[in-house]
């Protein structure tokens, strides 16, 4: 990135806007007036056009570079919703088979039937405000509909994956929280991913593409 990135670790900006969504876009003009608000993915061409309009309004003599020409890759098919794993956003989670036990190690049991777009936990997990931490025989089963499945994780260890009950792949996890690709496909498909975590791995957030 060749431009400044603002970090909001303490959620000061998030809370100042009483925001409940991610991603959320707030376009603000040169006078500090909020001119546009949008939630969720997509419609990036319209966003860019609005940004260019506000920049020109602020400085009509400034010559802007040509508009970007990037292929539109936002899925148009039905896609599983993003799901946070910590207890802070448990009300917005798509966990089935029981609720999280906050700030303690608890044993979970995955139901045999998981609706599309939902996930279930089994084994022992510690549930924190932003993440869940694998303790023993820790598994997440997620029934997805998407081209791609991603999970934000941290720690050092591995995830062993199954796809529709068959061995799929192993993902090595290392270091600070970042996005890992669990599944990718050219077309939108549904499937059941089984994710077995080694002890100490932390999982934060499922996203889909």
Task: Locate predicted features.
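Non-globular targeting/processing and membrane-anchoring segments
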Residues: 45-209
């Amino acid at each position: 990135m060749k431009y400044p990135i603002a970090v909001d670790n303490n959620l000061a900006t998030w809370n100042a806007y009483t925001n409940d969504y991610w991603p959320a876009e707030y376009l603000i003009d040169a006078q500090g007036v909020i001119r546009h608000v949008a939630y969720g993915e997509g419609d990036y061409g319209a966003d860019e056009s609005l940004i260019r309009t506000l920049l020109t309004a602020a400085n009509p003599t400034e010559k802007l570079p040509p508009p970007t020409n990037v292929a539109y890759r936002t899925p148009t098919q039905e896609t599983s919703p993003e799901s946070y794993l910590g207890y802070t956003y448990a009300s917005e989670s798509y966990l089935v088979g029981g609720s999280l036990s906050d700030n303690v190690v608890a044993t979970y049991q995955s139901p045999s039937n998981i609706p599309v777009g939902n996930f279930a936990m089994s084994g022992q997990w510690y549930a924190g405000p932003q993440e869940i931490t694998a303790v023993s025989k820790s598994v997440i089963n997620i029934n997805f509909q998407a081209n791609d499945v991603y999970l934000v994780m941290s720690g050092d260890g591995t995830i062993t994956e199954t796809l529709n009950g068959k061995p799929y792949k192993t993902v090595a996890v290392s270091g600070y929280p970042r996005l890992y690709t669990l599944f990718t496909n050219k077309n939108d498909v549904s499937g059941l991913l089984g994710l077995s975590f080694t002890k100490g791995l932390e999982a934060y957030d499922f996203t889909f593409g």
